[in-house]
Amino acid sequence: LTDPRKTTEAQAQALLKTAKPIYYITSGIHSPENGGPEMLIELAYRLIVEETPFIQEIRNNVITIITPVIEVDGREKQVDTYYYNKTRAPGDARLPLMYWGKYVQHDNNRDGMGQFLELTKAVTRMQLQWKPTIMHDLHEAQTYLYSSTGTGPYNDALDPITISEWWMLAQNDVLEMTKRGVPGVFTYGFYDGWVPNYMFFIAHTHNAIGRFYE
């Protein structure tokens, strides 16, 4: 389906009836953000062993690929820092994560175009090999949950269909979480949707959908 040079129109139409979408979830690119890596381990476990109709539907109809930690060295340092701080006496100052990301730290998520970092190259190889339908990068910025759409102006290279799909997915997130009584889930007002150097934009340059949570 990804290469019309190898697949005829008739073959593509037949594949559409049986092929499963691939949902690729990543997290841990920013080492001080702890929630995503922890949650993805739990999610992987539930997808494997849980037998509820909800999980069975996902397991039967979607191929889910999970990379719980993109920046593995920084994650190790974050874990070490956390356990060191637990040894500090009550009232003592807690040390922040002093060094991670091989000089770039938070800007390792600004390498989607330059492709200078090994972690970016690894994600690109993943995209090229598995061709996921959606790449979903998990972050952590506040006590709320932001599902990405952007305020605009959107990047000129983005197809309007892609922007509509952003909104469709985000609105479904907000609807489903609200239906389950989860407060603080929102979209729109967090970033603009213009700068194409985020890691999830790798998906957009390979005919897929990139999105993120904060």
Regions flagged by a language model, labelled:
Residues 4-8, 128-134, 188-205:
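Conserved alpha/beta core surface patches that mediate binding of polyanionic ligands
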Residues 98, 156, 160-164, 173, ...:
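Primarily the internal scaffold of c-type cytochrome electron-transfer domains
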